[in-house]
C-alpha cells in the first residue's frame, strides 16, 4: 500500500455510514453474529438513531443509521472482512452458520479467493475472506494496481 498524500496525512480517523431500514435487526446482526464491537449507540441525535461499530486499536468505524423507509441495496457495496487464514474465517462465520444465516452467491473474485458472503438484514453483503488484503493474498488475488500518480 502506498503512503498517504501529504494533504491527507493528518487524518486521524475514518468513519463510513450506511442507512438501514431494519435497524434493530441489523445492529444485532453486526454485533451478535458478525461480532463487531459496538462502541456507541445514539437516539435522536440531530434527528437520527444509530450505532457505531469499530475494531479495537483501529481508527476506522462503521455506522448504521436508522432509515425511515426502504433503502435501495447495491450488491457491489460490500463490507469485506479479511482474516489471516481459512481457520480464522471459519471461526468468524460459525455464529452465522449456527444462527441459520444462509450464504449468498459470492462475486466470482471472492469465490476464487476462498471468500464466503452472507447477507445482512437489509440484504447488503458481508464478505469473509481467508487472507488479508495487501499482506497474504492468494496467488492471482490482487486486482491490477494503478500506475498512475492520479489514481
Where are these regions (language model features)?
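Vicinal oxygen chelate
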Residues: 1-9, 12-21, 51-56, 70-151
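Short, flexible, solvent-exposed loop/turn segments with mixed acidic/basic and small polar residues
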Residues: 4-6, 67-71
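Core segments of cupin and vicinal oxygen chelate
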Residues: 8, 17-61
Amino acid at each position: 500500500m502506498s503512503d498517504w498524500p501529504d494533504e491527507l496525512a493528518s487524518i486521524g480517523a475514518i468513519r463510513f455510514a450506511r442507512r438501514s431500514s431494519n435497524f434493530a435487526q441489523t445492529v444485532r446482526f453486526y454485533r451478535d453474529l458478525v461480532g463487531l464491537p459496538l462502541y456507541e449507540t445514539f437516539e435522536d441525535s440531530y434527528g437520527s438513531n444509530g450505532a457505531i461499530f469499530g475494531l479495537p486499536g483501529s481508527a476506522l468505524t462503521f455506522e448504521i443509521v436508522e432509515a425511515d423507509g426502504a433503502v435501495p441495496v447495491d450488491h457491489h457495496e460490500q463490507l469485506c472482512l479479511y482474516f489471516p487464514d481459512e481457520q480464522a474465517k471459519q471461526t468468524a462465520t460459525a455464529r452465522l452458520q449456527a444462527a441459520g444465516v444462509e450464504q449468498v452467491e459470492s462475486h466470482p473474485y471472492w469465490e476464487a479467493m476462498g471468500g464466503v458472503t452472507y447477507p445482512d438484514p437489509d440484504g447488503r453483503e458481508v464478505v469473509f475472506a481467508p487472507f488479508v488484503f495487501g499482506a497474504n493474498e492468494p496467488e492471482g488475488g490482487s486486482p491490477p494496481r494503478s500506475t498512475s500518480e492520479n489514481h
